[in-house]
Regions:
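Helix-loop-helix junctions that connect adjacent transmembrane segments
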Residues: 195, 199-252
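C-terminal membrane-solvent junction of multi-pass transporters and transport-like membrane proteins
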Residues: 223-224, 374-383, 417-462, 484-504
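Cytosolic C-terminal regulatory domains/tails of membrane transporters and channels
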Residues: 1-38, 487-651
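Membrane-interface "cap" regions at the ends of multi-pass membrane proteins
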Residues: 1-62, 111-113, 117-125
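Loop-to-transmembrane helix boundary motifs in multi-pass membrane proteins
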Residues: 117-121, 161-170, 265-296, 364-399, ...
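Extracellular loop-to-transmembrane helix junctions
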Residues: 64-113, 119-125, 140-172, 196, ...
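Transmembrane-helix boundary/entry motifs in multi-pass membrane transporters
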Residues: 37, 48, 97, 101-134, ...
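Extracellular/periplasmic helix-exit of transmembrane alpha-helices
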Residues: 206-219, 269-275, 287-323
């Protein structure tokens, strides 16, 4: 490629762009530079579990209250349905996702392989829109909920009652600061928060179960009220199946669980292509998190339903949004209750950490590769700043209101889980695994039902998700438009025959003819040479090599280029290339030939028929169009020095 001198980067720029070369490419950089850069070897799976666990486990702060409001006395039964869906549905789905897509791209990567060209890109952008909805709302909703707990604390209410927006924005900014410091620090903080929070919840659960046992009448009162309200067990189960989608926030941790996979430490010596240790340990991570959460969901739903009066769950009630905190204060005293409050506020604030980690693993692996984000979007720290600013905007739009964001959050979670279920169903069918295919198909139907019910009840979630999708698609297409003339070939490799052709003509003036392959018969090449000679008034003795580019997938942006040489009809030398864009491939070849030979190559075109605008659209969408001027523009951007720029001739 073009070798242009650049001043050494500033310390701030170097710090901001640290890790740029290997983000989103799935492998470490090669060469001397790679040796200087520290390699993130990952963390043990149980520590990474805490990074996704701050999102997953923190829902205990509000899940029992949501279940009680949604299902009333049926809350424990509806929660059991949710746990069955978790362990028999979401868990096997995401264990398979971890196996099929072990680089943090989740089910989106699996579905991407099924669709090609622009329809595949638009489909991925739509799923990324829902992922952004899920992850960003996780950040803003959790921070807002933490600030709500803080503001509603009896000791702080008078001082903070009108400061919720400021507190929420401060918590989001602090979260961004942790990630600017680095992933290891985020995992360390998450490990401490989750450990303390689960221990405190275990104490509350044991205390609650003790009071259920010692106050035997509460069980009798509950079963009597259930029978009076619903009649028999079959009606209860039927109603529980109808209301359980309202409890879907309890499924929030799975997508982030596979999104943070790259941070799981693998076995010594394993490769990125076959990370068996990472896959095995991520399955442990998912299973352990699901089992822990299931135990807490059932026990907390049971004790809160039996021990807390129903009116306290209503808006304005003492247990509204803080059911377990209510029990902590009620049965373990205000000192323990205050410690529990602090732990809950801390984990709710940091719940956005797993979402931020998911965004940082997901977005840089797609958008820059599609040419739909700047090159620096592959680096971690600039993206942290971008996501933090977007979280500020979302918080401001929703006025830091937890309830207003709930619909969007649940919709994002359920759409991603449904897409994952469909992806593994297709994978099982392709692998010829009939039993798994049937099982995953049933799971897909369950999650699609849950999603539809949720959308009907909370249509605002789809509207907000649609805004994210529209925003991502619009920004992505604008970015692709602005980067249209970039040299987007990452490497050029010539086979032996191609290298021989280049060496041969380097002793004379290097002249290439850009040829659109048609029948590739002898007459095609003979007529093309004659036309180029006449158009450019070149003498008979001038030597030429043909260059032919076949467009593969024009929706792709960056890729390596392989150049193959062949002799056609025992006379005409032809270099053949495959690329997403003809002008980019030709420009990359010319710059490579210049750099390897030290000579300025010339390339000859004929004008393309059609209007400039129509030809630009053909180039933008299909990689073709008016090749000559676009090739020249790509060369101009890649090599500012006219004296060193390959020459483009058109006739």
């Amino acid at each position: 490629m073009a070798t242009t001198e650049h001043p050494p980067p500033s310390r701030l720029r170097a710090w901001m762009l640290e890790g740029l070369s290997d983000m989103g490419k799935g492998h470490a950089p090669k060469g001397a530079q790679a040796e200087k850069e520290p390699v993130d070897e990952g963390q043990p799976w149980y520590r990474v579990m805490c990074l996704t666990g701050v999102d997953y486990f923190s829902t205990l702060g509000y899940q029992p209250g949501i279940a009680a409001l949604a299902a009333g006395l049926l809350s424990p039964i509806a929660t059991i349905v949710l746990v069955i869906v978790t362990l028999a549905g979401a868990l096997p789905v995401y264990r398979r996702v971890a196996e099929e897509s072990p680089h943090g791209q989740g089910s989106i990567a699996m579905l991407e392989r099924l669709l090609t060209f622009w329809k595949g890109k638009l489909f991925v952008l739509t799923l990324l829109g829902f992922a952004a909805t899920d992850f960003l709302i996780t950040i803003t909703l959790s921070a807002a909920d933490a600030s709500t707990h803080l503001v509603e604390n009896p000791h702080l209410n008078s001082a903070l009652h009108d400061k919720q927006m400021v507190i929420t924005l401060t918590l989001v900014a602090l979260l961004g600061a942790v990630f600017l410091k680095g992933f290891l620090e985020a995992i360390g903080v998450a490990f401490a928060l989750v450990g303390v929070y689960l221990a405190l919840n275990a104490v509350v659960v044991v205390s609650g179960l003790y009071h259920v046992v010692t106050e035997g009448h509460v069980v009798t009162d509950w079963t009597t009220a259930l029978t009076a309200e619903h009649g028999n067990i079959f009606v209860m189960i039927g109603v529980a199946l109808i209301v359980f989608p309202k409890l879907a926030l309890g499924l929030s941790g799975f997508e982030t669980g596979v999104a943070v996979m790259p941070h799981v430490k693998g076995d010594p010596g394993e490769t990125e292509e076959k990370p068996k240790g990472r896959i095995r340990d991520t399955k442990k991570l998912l299973t352990t998190a699901a089992v822990i959460m299931s135990c807490f969901l059932i026990t907390t739903s049971f004790i809160t339903t039996l021990l807390i009066p129903e009116k306290e769950f209503e808006p304005g009630g003492e247990a509204n949004g803080r059911a377990l905190a209510f029990l902590a204060h009620e049965y373990l005293g205000n000192a323990f209750g205050t410690v529990y409050d602090v732990s809950t506020i801390a984990i709710l604030w940091f719940a956005g950490a797993s979402a931020m980690a998911g965004l940082l693993n997901l977005m840089p692996r797609y958008l820059p590769r599609y040419g739909m984000a700047p090159h620096w979007a592959r680096a971690v720290r600039p993206m942290v700043i971008v996501f933090t600013l977007v979280a500020f905007l979302v918080t401001w739009i929703f006025d830091a209101d937890v309830d207003a964001q709930g619909g969007a959050y649940a919709t994002g979670v359920l759409v991603l889980i449904s897409s994952a279920a469909i992806a593994v169903t297709i994978a099982a069918r392709k692998a010829g695994q009939r039993n798994w295919f049937i099982g995953f198909a049933v799971i897909s139907v369950v999650f699609l039902y849950t999603t539809v019910v949720n959308v009907i009840e909370r249509p605002d979630g789809v509207k907000i998700g649609a805004c994210f999708i529209a925003g991502i698609i619009l920004i992505s297409l604008l970015s692709r438009l602005l980067r249209a003339f970039e040299l987007r070939v990452t490497s050029v490799t010539l086979d032996d025959m191609a290298e021989r052709f280049v060496r041969d003509i380097a002793s004379r003036k290097i002249r290439f003819i850009a040829n659109e392959p048609d029948s590739r018969d002898k007459a095609e090449y003979r007529d093309k040479i004659e036309q180029i000679r006449q158009d450019n008034d070149l003498p008979e003795q001038e030597d030429f090599v043909f260059v032919e580019v076949t467009v593969t997938d024009p929706s792709e942006f960056e890729a390596g280029l392989t150049v193959r040489g062949q002799v056609m009809h025992n006379r005409y030398r032809v270099l053949t290339l495959e690329s997403s864009s003809i002008p980019n491939a030709l420009a990359a070849l010319l710059l490579n030939v210049r750099d390897t030979t030290g000579c300025i190559p010339h390339i000859y075109f004929e004008w393309t028929e059609g209007t400039p605008f129509a030809n630009f659209l053909r180039f933008f969408l299909f990689g073709q169009g008016e090749v000559a001027p676009v090739t020249r523009e790509v060369l101009r951007e890649a090599e500012p020095d006219r004296d060193h720029r390959p020459r483009v001739h058109t006739g």
